[in-house]
Amino acid sequence: MAKSDVIEVDGKIIEALPNATFRVELENGHIILCHIAGKMRMHYIKILPGDKVKLELTPYSLDKGRITYRYK
């Protein structure tokens, strides 16, 4: 899948789940499950409930995503 196929949206972490999975509320009110991108795991970037994040969704499955950035 090419990088241009992803949909980038912003959201807010609602709940931290096991295995670096999070429940995220999007700006439009939808709630989806997201996991942390590999580079964020490598650099030990911590994500807590209440953080604002950028995430990627694929056009094939809009109920799961990948967190790619945590806003400061």
Swiss-Prot record:
It is found in: Cytoplasm. InterPro entries: NA-bd_OB-fold, RNA-binding_domain_S1_IF1, S1_domain, TIF_IF1. The keyword Protein biosynthesis applies. GO terms for molecular function: ribosome binding; rRNA binding; translation initiation factor activity. It holds the Pfam family eIF-1a. Belongs to the IF-1 family. Component of the 30S ribosomal translation pre-initiation complex which assembles on the 30S ribosome in the order IF-2 and IF-3, IF-1 and N-formylmethionyl-tRNA(fMet); mRNA recruitment can occur at any time during PIC assembly. This is Translation initiation factor IF-1. It comes from Sulfurimonas denitrificans (strain ATCC 33889 / DSM 1251) (Thiomicrospira denitrificans (strain ATCC 33889 / DSM 1251)). The lineage of its organism: Bacteria, Pseudomonadati, Campylobacterota, Epsilonproteobacteria, Campylobacterales. The gene is infA.
